[in-house]
Amino acid sequence: MIDVALCMLTLVPGGMGGSETYARELTRQLHGIPDLRAVAYVPRSAQGFSRGIPETVVNRIRGKSSTPERLRSVITATAFSRSIRQRMSGAAIVHYPFTVPAPRPSRHQSFIQTVLDVQHLDHPELFSGAELVYRKYFYDAPARRADLIITISEFAKQRIMHHLVIAPERITVAHLGVDRSQFVPNYGAREDFVLYPARSWPHKNHARLVKAMTLLRRERPSLRLVLTGGGLDALKGLPDWVERRGLIPADQLRSLYQRAAVMVFPSLYEGFGLPPLEAMASGCPVAASALGAIPEVCGDAAVLFDPRDPGAIAKGILQAIERGPVLSRTGGDQVAKFTWEHCRDLHVEAYREVIRRR
């Protein structure tokens, strides 16, 4: 029996994008695996996060999203590290799905770190000085010490190897997945709006998308833009044809995927990118960035464009509308390649590999 502690004390519910989907699904998929016993350790603010494996709540820690508040959570976890480690002492492996090893495992435990991407090293201009320092000490330095790193794309693996000089055999790639039972494809008529589900982080590239839509509306003046995700109030001066939905329930997002003319994904950088796959599972045509891991995820089932050029974004959206029926069919084939069960199996094999190396 392999005992694994999923230490998620830096979790901020509703504030961590696709990484939160990944970690939650991991708690579901690791339940009931023969010869594996996993327990999730979560902060008080995330009580009830686990969807399958047992959960232990650490009451002294409450996750928040700003850099100072995240640092405070790490300091708190470190201050109470003895008692937290005692609670996790039965685990042979401590796995940190949210990257930051807080608290560090004991010397008697193996240490696995999930590193979703190294965007801060590829694009430091998108981060504050404080955030870069935080990631240097709590992302990069621990990664060099980890027994194994799990990442979510070949693109991310190559960038981790490049920046952190880590041998390829110490990095496992586990593509994320989509639960197709949660998405009902619509291959029929669609409405006159473009959907972009993303938080207002700088690399999500909302400003260029609005410029692209302005160009596109010269040909299609009825076309609207619907934005979902957290922090959208930070986007100022949006035209009246842009609709800000903010954070919405999963069923509402699935409905938007079913009805949108196109799901656009103009991100400048992704370690993976779940929304294109979710859109494909809904039969929605996808126009997406040609940067980062996005081509690896989308394959030939999306129109790819240069996200740095508003004209290219506009052209990509228009092509996706025109090729809608074909993209709907090829998207279904593409999304079938990405399952949470396969993601789980690669994690389980990573755990077993770490035990074999001990």
Model-flagged regions — what are they?
Residues 1-358:
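Carbohydrate transferase catalytic cores enriched for Leloir-type hexosyltransferases
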